[in-house]
Amino acid sequence: MDYQKIINIAVIAHVDAGKSTLVDAFLKQSHVFKDNEKVVDCIMDSNDLERERGITIYSKNCSVTYKDYKINIVDTPGHADFSSEVERIIKTVDTVILLVDSAEGPMPQTRFVLQKALEIGLKPIVVVNKVDKPNCRPEEVYEMVFDLMFSLGATEDQLDFPVIYGSAKNGWMGEDYSKPTDNIDYLLDKIVEVIPAPTQIDGDPQMLITSLDFSNYTGRIAVGRVHRGVMRDGMNVSICHRDGKVEKTKIKELHTFEGMGHLKTDMVESGDICAVVGLDRFEIGDTITDFENPEALPPIAIDEPTMS
């Protein structure tokens, strides 16, 4: 894998704007599923509570391949109760896709997440979704997004954001909302055109744990983006806990994301998102780092998602 061709993106929006549906469209277009496999809509909503409520609570990781690019995609919560989850995730990506409903426009939660993305210097790609709705107003919604970004202090470059129109549900994206296409290639082309590849940083390894996964076979799995250096399968590492304590442990397996699943690998370089298997004790916000010279990354705020 050419690590200059890895792109990390997050999909952010208010609840019901179509985030999970868009991620599903990425996966379907990239032929993640075989012809005889049944594709369940809202593939990313795998948690039982999420399927029951029809909203995304926890961030998920998957990846698609497009024109020799590996695109790591994080589908983030859109519900206001989980804003810290969103804030945590956008710090691991190269840019965000800001998805807005073509009838409703940007909502309060959109404002919060967008502000966080702008503050750390990300330039969003704006997708005006659901343009097939009879009450859609895509041009007005575009102006609303521009005005919102301006009010949030966006730079001149950030205000020059690309905008794509389409219907994730119907599997198309294009430049003109009045001219439906038959795929989402226009959005994928825009992603690889405007998003810079991650910068590789040499040195002792560092990875901030930004989310957790779980396997019945291996237990808890640490997920995050390698910030510096190289993580290797079987290497001895230190875990710098948020309270300042440092523990020594060993990586049993390293996985990258491929489609909806994990792919075991020997090494992961800086800039890629990976899953680390076999660590003893860890939490979100801890740093996996060099065994001999442990160096923590700045911690992140944690709020446990709760729903009534």
For each of these PLM feature ranges, what is it?
Residues 1-100, 104-106, 144, 212-215:
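P-loop NTPase switch module centered on the Walker A-proximal segment
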Residues 119, 164-165, 296-307:
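Flexible hinge/switch segments at interdomain interfaces of large molecular machines
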